[in-house]
Amino acid sequence: MSAAKIKKGDKVVVLAGKDKGKRGEVLKAIPKEGRVVVQGVNVVKRHTRPTNTAAGGIVEKEASIHVSNVAHEDPKDGSPTRVGFKVLEDGRKVRYAKRSGDVIDG
């Protein structure tokens, strides 16, 4: 399996769907299904039954969207960019924005 290009905590832009153009942070990545949960994107209403600990009612929460419908936010100017991998001089393998060449993670 290839390395994950989008991980938890990344800043992304939605490219397609009802929330096209929205920006947010990845709350959860689901690599086996190829899906991500993005903060404030694809919000759905869930009807929950009351339990001993929690009250019932209608709860809004983010549903997952397919990873192909999101792109990384370029660290330099905030526009959508593709992600590549490169090995630095010290031997670390890092993700970088193909648009600007900036390193995404540390």
UniProtKB/Swiss-Prot annotation:
Record-level Gene Ontology MF annotations: rRNA binding; structural constituent of ribosome
Q: Key word rRNA-binding present in the record?
A: yes
Q: Does the keyword rRNA-binding apply?
A: yes
Q: Which Gene3D superfamilies match?
A: 2.30.30.30
Query: Which GO biological-process labels does this protein carry?
Result: translation
Q: Family, per the entry? A: Belongs to the universal ribosomal protein uL24 family.
Q: Describe its partners and assembly state.
A: Part of the 50S ribosomal subunit.
Q: What does this protein do?
A: One of two assembly initiator proteins, it binds directly to the 5'-end of the 23S rRNA, where it nucleates assembly of the 50S subunit. One of the proteins that surrounds the polypeptide exit tunnel on the outside of the subunit.
Q: PANTHER family of this UniProt entry?
A: MITOCHONDRIAL RIBOSOMAL PROTEIN L24 (PTHR12903)
The name this protein goes by in its record: Large ribosomal subunit protein uL24
* Organism the protein comes from: Rhodospirillum rubrum (strain ATCC 11170 / ATH 1.1.1 / DSM 467 / LMG 4362 / NCIMB 8255 / S1)
